[in-house]
């Protein structure tokens, strides 16, 4: 927020164990929803040395080869040998998936009036800010780009000693609410045992950090922490147990906006934890893109089995060109925030979810909730 003079956010790579779990859950969701767009899916994953455990509730008319999906995701990430601490080809895959509760289903199923109740109660937030071209907070945006580049250089063998697990953290200095300098960068990456620490640190600086961060933000006092603990050979599920839904701040706005607490991955769009958070981003981004405010946070809330949101509120942090209450009226006029309305507005019954499960659900083009197609209608209020 603008009151902070310094702000820090972090990200993790696709090879981080929690992100592995997210990607597995979303790959299973995609496989099911591809054949059965109206399926109900809530899939959780745990990964630890030598095994992946999948559990949850599913209601569907299709069948998917769950074990094959799990193995392929792990191999795609890059865990393909025991030398790396995990091998998707040989790990155990345990299946604990059951059916969706009939009590939940009855409140969510669509009635004749096209109403569809929310899959659960809860509160969700959406956010946008004009401090980057993507209308995302700069600290989390650049944190994502660092680990994304780490994965790219690992996969194309530019830095062949890189391994899949990595974390980044970026601390930015703000002046009048705008980022102006990098105070600190942390990048920890798993690596093969044959690379010297000095060589690793130099390569990470020259090939990952400097190409990603704006040169004009780097200064003589910027702190760089590259693998600050030294050796990082043991990583991934061998180093830490990974669970779906444990990186909800990485998935959203890096802590710069509030969070309702609900995770995204493994959940079909009838779950408002996911779909309403996507809608919140869509609404907030269009408000900022339309010039109604330079920063916008929206909160929506729901009751299980009820279609209409129990509340819609907006905070523009004093940057609004019109009042926050007037913006709420515009939101109600131009955006359908009932669960079915969100699904149709954002075309969410498609197998689009696995790519969201690494490097952030927001701020990347190609997702329907990143469109700014409502800006002209919203500008009419100015």
UniProtKB/Swiss-Prot annotation:
Keyword set, alphabetical order: ATP-binding, Cytoplasm, Magnesium, Metal-binding, Nucleotide-binding, One-carbon metabolism, Potassium, Transferase
Cofactor note: Binds 2 divalent ions per subunit.
Known role: Catalyzes the formation of S-adenosylmethionine (AdoMet) from methionine and ATP. The overall synthetic reaction is composed of two sequential steps, AdoMet formation and the subsequent tripolyphosphate hydrolysis which occurs prior to release of AdoMet from the enzyme.
UniProt GO cellular component terms: cytoplasm
Catalytic reaction annotation: L-methionine + ATP + H2O = S-adenosyl-L-methionine + phosphate + diphosphate
Protein name in the entry: S-adenosylmethionine synthase
Entry keyword Magnesium: yes
InterPro entries according to UniProt: ADOMET_SYNTHASE_CS (IPR022631), S-AdoMet_synt_C (IPR022630), S-AdoMet_synt_central (IPR022629), S-AdoMet_synt_N (IPR022628), S-AdoMet_synthetase (IPR002133), S-AdoMet_synthetase_sfam (IPR022636)
